[in-house]
Amino acid sequence: MFCLLCLCLTLGVWAFEPFRFAVVTDIHINVHAQTPSDDLRQTVAAINSDDSTDFVLVTGDIADAGDGASLRMAHDLLSKLNKPWYIIEGNHDQNWSESGCMDFLKIFGYERFTFEHKGIRFIGIPTGPMMRMAMGHVAPEDIDYVTSVLRSNGKGADAEPVFLVSHMPMQPADVDNWYELTDAIRPYPVVAFINGHYHRDLHFTYDGIPGIVNVTNLRQKGHSAGQYNLISLAADSIRVYTQAVGGTRHCWLTLPFTTHNDDDSTHWAPRPSYAVNDDYPQVTEQWTRDQGAAIFSSPVVWNKRVYAADNAGRVVCYDHEGQELWRHQTGARIIGTPAIGKGIIVVASADSCIYGLDAKSGQQRWCVRTGAPSVSAVTITDGTAYVGSGDHRFRAIRVSDGKVVWQADGIKGYVETRPLVIADKVVFGDWDNTLYCLDRRNGQRLWTWQPPNKDNMHYSPAGCWPVAADGCVFICDPERAMTAIDLNSGQQRWRTYQSKVRESIGLSQDGRRLYAKTMQDSIVCYAADGQAPRELWATDCGFGYEHARVMLVEKDGVVFASNKDGLIMALDGKTGRLLWKHKTGNTMINTVEPLSRNRIVFTNEAGKVGELGVRS
């Protein structure tokens, strides 16, 4: 009798006309590969021939390399659908975007969506990681968007049931702040999440809320076409089918249609632990500020002021106690770390401008327009700013007035790194498998270097900030190798896979030691020796699996590192002895800025800016 009553209540509250929609995900379009576009073309034709499908959700990983050409190809193919379709970004679209994800916005017209269909509401958001190798992350501005829509939708009997649409599943292993979203939506009538990412059909539960993970559109081995999913909604049930293009359809999941999800917190995923902070009570957060938008760049410190640039396109200036002094709004997100010289903060924006702002007042002094968005970090030396852009040009700009001193054309990929300026040379990597060395005086190309796996852009030497010592440039790249390259000739001196490093590197202040973060637990130190790789020490810091591309920085004999899980670590630079660890959150900490061995300024992906203090 009780079950019948519940069913009647469900039918009474959620009375709507049953309908069906399609989910197409992980299409991985590549302008250089025929099969993914063929698979999508056939899927579009199959959906068009099915009059019982009302609309289509396209749930991320649209372009395999996040490039504009592949996104445009995907748009052209999807535009042939004869029914409405709604799209969101996946990690491939956000992590390796030459435009800082501005191409996606320009081509598809939005980065998040909401719509109502036959009494059911759908909300779609991106889940990162944005321009960094890190965990998935729901940006604070996207959580605000979801909660704003849910508040408008209401909680009562007249509120529409809601489906949340995202590429990444809301699991601890996928999205570092999953709990912030599940906690935010819990009071509202959420039915389920609809996801992609895993390339196969899966049913998860995210803190008591069902998650429907859908199979990739890419064809399975031995098949000549791909597949997609169909989701049928009725007042009492959700049924999920996989439809092979030109083949059979099978139902692989049936769920009750309900918003009464599991509220027993003992069944939820464990929340992040901050117990490590109890082990090192000498470390405290002196001040923190929530900037209200994701931050993907390091803090900049100048004249007792702290500057942070964010995903909302703002540069915000704080005093040494964290009080905001000014903010300047650019036209699009800022990804790369700015730099300050001659009292001017130089920042590259995805609005296709490089700005020079007065570091005291925030007033714009000048702007250099580029032919495409820029996500590059900036280096300033002797009054000249060196910065890359998405228009395949690298520029040297006079800081005082914004005059372009020179520009180097023909940079094949986009530039993300902070350029290394050493003697008469400028060294930087791009996301087309190339490390460049230019003449600092005129931009003339002196040499280039490429990794062994030079045909796969995902192995590009582009994420790490190069360092130089002993006549060599040192880098770590995604092939899990550390490499020494002759600074004058560009010839490879040595390359080692010994420590399984990734894209994080640093140099001691005396130029004698290289620091790197491995992909499992350890910080390692090598001699800054151009003749052969020689490990000096390795310390197990216990941080687990790691792949965030954040650099290591030494100050006053202490080397500082950070990771994807919100941990900042300090080690003795000479011995590797672990001095302390402190967890500031559960998301990626950008490369930190130490003021001394006992004061460290940091930013994180959640939009937090702050300073740590260490008691001696």
What is each residue range found by the language model?
Residues 209-276:
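Binuclear metal-dependent phosphoesterase catalytic core
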